[in-house]
Amino acid sequence: RMPDGSKIPYWNTFYQKVFYDPIDAQDLLKQFGMQYASAEELADLVNKQLKENVNPADMNLGRWANMHNEICDYLDSRCKYLGQMDLNLKSPLVWDFYKNTLQKLAGYGAAIIRLDAFAYAPKAPGSHNFMNEPETWNTLERVRELAAPYGLTLLPEIHASYEEKTYEKVANYGYLTYDFFLPGLLIDAIEQKDGTTLAGWANELIEKHIVTVNMLGCHDGIPLLDLRGLLPEERIAGLIDLIVARGGFVKNLHGQKNVYYQVNATYYSALGEDDRKMLVARAIQLFMPGKPQVWYLDLFAGKNDHEAVAKAGEGGHKEINRTNLTIEQIHSALT
């Protein structure tokens, strides 16, 4: 809903959840001039259905059915959105916003700027939702031109399977590349007691002069879709089963059980909460080609936070690896 009251839908790539605030009799008195007893009864009727997640358009308002449109408009005017809004790349205002944001980040001392889910940015009706070419590269180059005066290096976050070779394209265009293969390869190597594939990947990075930022745990899950082409499907499935057995959660795409994306778990828990395995994994990461990125929770051997997931409710699976540690917990983990 825009400031002028008009409701304009936007193309949202990831998710969208709408929250409707409950109303009370005083709201209805002011808005519609109702009698208090009627307003109280209608407010109770509306709030009961909101609590049951009934969409306002589908509400049964009983003897106030003639007010249905007015009530819907009123609820819409007070709703809140949870989601990620897509920006219109054709608007000069968006590019002004990008420039100002890059300038501000540079002013804070930033050197590397992660471009989250970047390959979704230049989508268009009738085209793919992800990684349109050459639009993706043209857009990325335009952002690089904005970043250059501030001495900023760009890190495009683009998830794709190994067999698609997108990581090579990113590197060939002169950008830092996220090494999303390392987290899964390390767990596989440790659990299988076989570092052949991991060593092969390290050699490829060196031979092809691919400059990466790598990681173990992160604010999202452990990427497994990316491993296609590096590991056989049965090895990937085995990794999923192992991490889930150790308390992780699988994020399925589009409700299809076999179309996996990430397993959500702390890296420490994914390794069976084994100190030696975690230390070996971190040591290998630090000596792998690339710039190591360390997720704060891994520093303190963070375990799967199932309580946080339960509190977050539906869609809260990522909270398993986002625990806010107290000073006492930090001191305890360091001793």
What is the predicted role of each segment?
Residues R1-T335:
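Active-site and adjacent substrate-binding regions of carbohydrate-active enzymes
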